[in-house]
């Protein structure tokens, strides 16, 4: 995990990230190595990681709901963005474990060219309520 020490615990995090490669392009096979991260995926992990850290997100411990708003200009199916984004959030300590996601909400947006990612923690015993789509104001994550 690449989380800076002392990342503050918060109830919710919203960040903007570059559009990830499609899940179909994350791994490659061959060269006698078995499955391995593609060059495109490695480049995205590096660039998106720097973008994430620059926004100084807190940490959402325990179970959470993941909301992804993918730009309509993206050429991939929006459900192909979940794995890369979830893995990045775990790698950088925004979530403890991406298996703690109890729900994912995906939607298209036309506001900008990045993926708007919101992680909402579920407090102990909190019921899952219907969630309205969220389009965060850009100034909230700048």
Name what the model sees in each region.
Residues 1-142:
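Acidic, proline/glycine-enriched N-terminal capping motif
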């Amino acid at each position: 995990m690449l989380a800076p020490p002392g990342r503050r615990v918060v109830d919710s995090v919203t960040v903007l990230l570059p559009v990830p490669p499609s899940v179909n392009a994350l791994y490659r096979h061959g060269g006698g190595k078995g499955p391995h991260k593609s060059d495109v995926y490695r480049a995205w992990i590096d660039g998106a990681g720097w973008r994430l850290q620059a926004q100084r997100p807190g940490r959402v411990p325990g179970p959470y709901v993941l909301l992804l708003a993918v730009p309509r200009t993206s050429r991939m199916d929006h459900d192909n963005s979940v794995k890369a984004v979830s893995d990045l959030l775990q790698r950088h300590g925004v979530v403890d474990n991406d298996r703690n996601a109890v729900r994912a909400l995906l939607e298209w947006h036309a506001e900008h060219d990045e993926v708007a990612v919101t992680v909402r923690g579920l407090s102990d015993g909190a019921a899952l309520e219907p969630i309205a789509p969220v389009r965060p104001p850009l100034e909230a994550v700048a």
